[in-house]
Amino acid sequence: MHRKFLDKNKGMIFIYDKVEIINIWMYNTYIPLDIIFLKNKNIKNLKKNASPCLQLPCESYSSREPIDTVIEINAGMSDQLKLKIGDNLEIFSGTNIVF
């Protein structure tokens, strides 16, 4: 990732071609993040405050079940937005996410 900051209310979205179990690590990530794992716009797992990792080995965070999308946002944002497993997210134009 190599980011040292992420603007408030910004994030990164990763859309996968295939529905599968996804493991995310934080190698070369300098800031803590909340990782949201989704399938069909439904939150299936949520890792809050995933720690930065600058040296291997790094902890891996699993979706625990097959998913098709991952969203990474600033640590703490999922609590501020009151996100929880089972919530649905609508994604418009690949840039705006409605909670």
Predicted features along the sequence, with ranges:
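Compact, glycine-rich, soluble single-domain proteins
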Residues: 1-99
